[in-house]
Amino acid sequence: MSKQQAQFTNPETPGYVGFANLPNQVHRKSVRKGFEFTLMVVGESGLGKSTLINSLFLTDLYPERVVPGAADKIERTVDIEASTVEIEERGVKLRLTVVDTPGYGDAMNCVDCFKPIISYVDNQFERYLHDESGLNRRHIVDNRVHCCFYFISPFGHGLKPLDVEFMKALHNKVNIVPVIAKADTLTLRERERLKRRVLDEIEEHGIKIYQLPDAESDEDEDFKEQTRLLKASIPFTVVGSNQLIEAKGKKVRGRLYPWGVVEVENTEHNDFLKLRTMLITHMQDLQEVTQDLHYENFRSERLKKGVTSSKVEHVEVTKDQILQEKEAELRRMQEMITRMQAQMQIQGQSGDAQHL
């Protein structure tokens, strides 16, 4: 048997076809292509949203942000700010988009303050549907919101009416993960009491938050235990900080108080590591739920309405426009085929002339 032939045979395992290598192929292709993920953060100002996001991904997404004064907040409207950063770790690339909502809950009158957020989420679904309906679908950018961290104030006794209204308005569109901010302002007993109160009110109002899937029966025991702990930690109580301080002879990220140090990455102090673990280990599931549940619900509703018209960033997209775009793409493809045929004819004629 030749050396070249031996490369394509496997005498040691008769009957082996090679399908077992398919996951490796998918893995290599995914690593080359990279991953896309969009995270939305919503909550009142002063709850440490920006600090937490920077702590989670060890980057500064808001280097030029200006914090508004108290007078500016009285009539402030909700802005939508999307920041995209390319993160690479051990050869794996992640295109992370963080959608912030400065101004949410800040104004004296917060009625309908979450409507711009709903419009943004719907616009991303609409854009994806429009791109998916085109002929060139190879390079569709997925800007749909895959997860929403909803920040709850630790200074109340549970959910505010605005919290309930927002989550009920968004829970059928986005995977909502409730987060109790500034956990260092609460004692351990207060923390557990607030967690139970928030969960009870979420159930009472019929709010659907993101449910972590159960671990498969063939998963190892460590992963099963990790999944159980993550589920038991919802809503996550977190502390964020980008400052390095010295504690017990080592540098840690945390906050220094007269009574001691709160370490960001210490599970005994807060749920920061659990939140990050949940996001990283369930990133694929968050994307799948977005695709299979939230986007499909949106798409079904659009199809029922006949996709008569909609707005994608204030640009009207109608059936006629979609048909025109498809016709234009078909014309371009036909022109390309015609040019290729003409070139082949010229080459064929020149070849015949040489033989003569």
UniProtKB/Swiss-Prot annotation:
Residues 33-305 form the Septin-type G domain. Residues 259-269 are annotated as: Important for dimerization. GO terms for molecular function: GTP binding; GTPase activity; molecular adaptor activity. Residues 43-50 are annotated as: G1 motif. Residues 181-184 are annotated as: G4 motif. InterPro entries: G_SEPTIN_dom, P-loop_NTPase, Septin, Septin2. Its main location: cytoplasm. The keyword Cell cycle applies. Belongs to the TRAFAC class TrmE-Era-EngA-EngB-Septin-like GTPase superfamily. Septin GTPase family. PANTHER family: SEPTIN. This is Septin-2A. The lineage of its organism: Eukaryota, Metazoa, Chordata, Craniata, Vertebrata.
